[in-house]
Every structure is written in structure tokens, then in C-alpha cells.
């Protein structure tokens, strides 16, 4: 009887192990399939872009296409250098505006603010992340564009800075608006990275005689630099891929960028505006 009981237990354990192994195999297959689908989607997008784009670029000429400074689809002239530079300038401006503000805000929320302030500011930051791009664009048209237009027309700009002929819809306006739009990403990711730094770093710095501020900026912040860098990269991705808000405030001129307060067009804006020409290529 003890032997039969032992055999029954062994069979039960074997059956459970076999079932668990089967479940594990099924879940592994499901996860592998999901990963393959994600990779396949990226591959198909690349294949579609190259299959439809390379013949057209071959007709135009790679150098004329990439380095051409004139964009006139009606005359079969397709030079995208102004849009490439426009995207780079707007993204750089957004990073200059957004990164310092976002990083300092994250440091404040992580190490300096009171719980009461956190309860107010964190939901506000999350709310900024949920606002649609077109709403940001509308805010830029109604608030930022008139403000910049009045600023460039002021006597200070004309007499002191010697800036004349500026416009409200410009590189500056687009950079400021995009800088505001990337704030939630930079603040959230940077704060998470700062909160993840072991408290021993901060306490050790205090034990060596450093002040609270020096401990935060010279011990905690360097330890979180990889997360902060990730936040900046995500902000760059958000800025360089933004379309609707930039279309509404950048002016959308297809010439080479001429100045901080002059209009320009980005790559994403050009795709939206000139979509009608794509069918005839």
C-alpha cells in the first residue's frame, strides 16, 4: 500500500509537471509570436518605404533629392534639404527650451518639493501628456504667435538686437511650443530615474559634509544620468516626430531656414501638406 501511494503521488507530480511544462511552452510560443509580429511590422514598414521611395529617388537623383534646396512638386523639383534642416533646427530649439526646464522640475519634484506640492504638480504634468497635439497647436496660434509677433515688432528688437522683419509663425515659436510639449516626457522619466537612485548615495554625501543641494546635484543626479539621457532621447523623438502643432505655428515656407524669427517647414509637416502629390509620383 505505501508503494502504491508513492507511485500515485509520483504520477500526480509528473502530471502536474507535464501540464506546467505544456503551459510554459504555450506561453513562450505566444510571447515569441507577439515579438515576431512587432518585428515584422517594422520590417514591413521599411520594405514599403524603400519599395515605393527608392524608384522615385532614383528618378530624381539622390543628391538632388537630399541636397536640393528647392521644393516645387508642381514643377517636378523635389529638394528636401530645407525640410531636413527645419526638422533639426526645431528639434534643437525644443531641446534647448525643454530639457533644462524639465530636468530642473524633475529634480524639484524628486528631492525638494513637499508632498502637498507633489499631489498637485504630478497630476498636472500627467495632464500635459494627455493633451492632443492639435490643442497645443491651437494654443500656439492664439497665444504664442501673437506674442512673438508683438515681440519682434517692438523697438527693443529693432534698435538693440537689430532684428527686423520677424514673424510670429517662426522657428522660435515652433521651438517654444515643442519645448512645452516634451516637458511631460522629460519630467516623468527623469523623476523616475532620480527616485530609483539608492538613498545611500544621498546619505553618504551628507555624511561627508555636503549640503542638501550639493548632495542632490553632485551625488544623486550623476547616478541617474542614464535615465536622464533616456528622457532626453525620448524628448527628441517626440519633438522630431511632431506634426500637427508644428504645421500650425511654423509658417511652413519651403525655403532654407533664414533666421530664428522666420518661417520654415519640417519633414513631418511636409509629408502632411504635400500628401496629395505622393499619389502621382
Model-derived regions: residue spans:
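Transmembrane-helix boundary motif in ABC transporter permease subunits
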Residues: 19, 94-125, 146
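Residue-level signal for discrete positions within transmembrane alpha-helices
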Residues: 83, 87, 123-126, 130, ...
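Interhelical loop and adjacent transmembrane-helix boundary motif
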Residues: 246-281
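Membrane-interfacial helix termini and adjacent extracytoplasmic/periplasmic loops
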Residues: 59-78, 138-180
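Periplasmic/extracellular loop-to-transmembrane helix junction in inner-membrane transport proteins
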Residues: 14, 18-25, 29, 51-94, ...
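Transmembrane alpha-helices
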Residues: 127, 131, 186-190, 197, ...
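N-terminal signal-anchor/first transmembrane alpha helix
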Residues: 21-47
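Hydrophobic positions within alpha-helical transmembrane segments of bacterial inner-membrane proteins
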Residues: 40, 87, 91, 95-103, ...
